[in-house]
């Protein structure tokens, strides 16, 4: 039991004075891993429920994701009426070729123009996710269908810094995505919350020798495409589905792209998405300010890195919650090798390895900061806080990077900062190795304060009941 004598090397005061909107959720993209493993119920339990699941002989706490991003593929292996076929990058990784539904250059209205049987595994995982409570679904595109591109290569233009969507296919790309959204609603039982027609569009990493699908769009073209998509969704009775944009690679690119859109383009967008690959850099505040000035919210719709220890994840996630004020956060590859996956896996061979330490770091956020909570000011650069108004519960997640120390948490700015002497539940994960979502019942409130001893490189989550703003 932590002694009821105040002791701390650091103190942070949680403030309810400012809230940053309701938290919408945590999630994961389904491409590419679900195309390989989409038939596995245990993976669906692990990612989309908060149940404990036995996996490879180990009991794993479910992450409780409630957001999925479903990828509209760009690849097909049939021949167009003019005899053309898809051009495949010499460096393309086969498991990153996602099946597309629209047959090349065929009439939109005929049933034979669409092959709705492909991509069964990714759809299966989306359905499993829905049955486990997922309630935000985003349809996104890495590239238009290959036959809409200038070089028939869904990895990108021969020059990765040039547009690869043919000008006369801007609307066709929008039609493709809107048609999938309509099919999902009418036949799959899934209503997409949003549709994103772009993926890191201003970057130039895409190209004809790429290892994955990708397509460069200059900013004027992006503006046109989101307008087309808004109109195509509306024409199909899908006006409640948001258009999201632009999933730029970095925060700074996202700000520049958003500010470049004209009034019609901005009015067509219902939410701004960014990726988190600027990591510890970039001006998150500028993006937040630009987006909120337009009355919208921002998602970090894709984050990933190769650090299996969890150090980068917790550092960058805390930066997002403190400065970007995103209302959702989505991880890229749930299963992958080289440290990228939350679970180590070789998608090419279909083999699955161990759960990474960063999985357990992420669990400290996803299992406790839940949809509908309000993000508060944590009072320091190592603390984030969320408040559940219906349960009158405060969630605190904090990390200690330096030498082992006591950290004191001060709740005196709340009208009721818990109940003196009450138990504060806590969970702990150590970065790199050590504790993996370990649960402790040894921490108690002393007035409106409590403290805990943090080893070096340790992340903890605390739940405090009977807190009133």
How would you name each of these model-derived features?
Residues 295-369, 373-381:
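Aromatic/acidic polysaccharide-binding cleft in carbohydrate-active enzymes
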Residues 9, 14-192, 227:
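N-terminal catalytic cores of secreted or lumenal carbohydrate-active enzymes
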Residues 1-7, 469:
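Fungal secretory targeting signals
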Residues 172-191, 201-306:
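Active-site neighborhood of glycoside hydrolase catalytic domains
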Residues 22-30, 66-72, 76-79, 136-140, ...:
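Structural recognition of the beta-strand scaffold that forms the well-ordered cores
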Residues 441-469:
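C-terminal beta-strand-rich structural cap/linker in extracellular carbohydrate-active enzymes
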Residues 414-435:
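Solvent-exposed beta-hairpin/edge-strand motifs
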Residues 378-420, 457:
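Carbohydrate-binding surface patches
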């Amino acid at each position: 039991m932590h002694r009821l004598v105040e002791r701390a090397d650091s103190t942070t005061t949680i403030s309810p004075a400012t809230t940053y909107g309701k938290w919408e959720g945590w999630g994961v993209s389904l491409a590419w891993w679900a195309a390989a493993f989409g038939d596995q119920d245990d993976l669906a339990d692990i990612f989309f429920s908060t149940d404990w699941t036995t996996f490879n002989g180990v009991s794993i706490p479910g992450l409780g994701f409630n957001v999925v991003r479903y990828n509209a593929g760009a690849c097909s292996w049939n021949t167009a009426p003019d005899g053309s076929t898809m051009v495949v990058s010499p460096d393309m990784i086969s498991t990153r070729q996602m099946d597309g539904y629209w047959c090349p250059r065929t009439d939109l209205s005929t049933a034979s123009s669409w092959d709705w049987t492909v991509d069964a595994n990714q759809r299966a995982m989306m359905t499993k996710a829905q049955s486990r409570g997922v309630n935000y679904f985003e349809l996104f595109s890495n590239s238009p269908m290959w036959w809409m591109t200038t070089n028939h290569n869904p990895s990108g233009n021969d020059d990765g810094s040039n547009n690869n969507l043919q000008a006369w296919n801007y609307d066709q790309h929008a039609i493709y995505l809107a048609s999938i959204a309509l099919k999902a609603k009418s036949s799959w039982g899934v209503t997409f919350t949003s549709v994103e027609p772009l993926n890191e569009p201003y970057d130039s990493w895409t190209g004809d020798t790429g290892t994955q699908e990708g397509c460069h769009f200059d900013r004027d073209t992006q503006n046109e495409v989101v307008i087309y998509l808004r109109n195509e969704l509306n024409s199909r009775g899908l006006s409640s589905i948001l258009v999201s944009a632009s999933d730029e690679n970095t925060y700074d690119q996202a700000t520049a792209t958003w500010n470049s859109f004209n009034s019609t383009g901005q009015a067509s967008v219902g939410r701004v998405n960014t990726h988190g690959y600027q990591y510890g850099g970039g001006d998150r505040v500028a993006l937040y300010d630009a987006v909120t000035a337009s009355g919208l919210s921002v998602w970090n719709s894709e984050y990933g890195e190769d650090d299996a220890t969890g150090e980068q994840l917790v550092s960058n996630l805390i930066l997002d919650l403190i400065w970007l004020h995103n209302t959702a956060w989505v991880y890229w590859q749930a299963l992958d090798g080289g440290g990228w996956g939350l679970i180590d896996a070789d998608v090419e061979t279909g083999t699955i390895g161990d759960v990474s330490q960063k999985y357990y770091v992420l669990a400290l956020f996803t299992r406790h900061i839940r949809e509908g909570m309000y993000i508060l000011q944590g009072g320091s650069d190592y603390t984030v806080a969320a408040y559940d108004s219906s349960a009158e519960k405060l969630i605190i997640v904090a990390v200690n990077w330096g030498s082992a120390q006591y950290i004191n948490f001060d709740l005196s700015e709340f009208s009721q900062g818990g109940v003196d002497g009450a138990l504060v539940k806590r969970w702990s994960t150590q970065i790199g190795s050590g504790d993996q979502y370990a649960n402790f019942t040894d921490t108690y409130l002393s007035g409106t304060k409590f403290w805990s001893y943090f080893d070096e490189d340790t992340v903890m989550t605390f739940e405090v009941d009977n807190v009133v703003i």
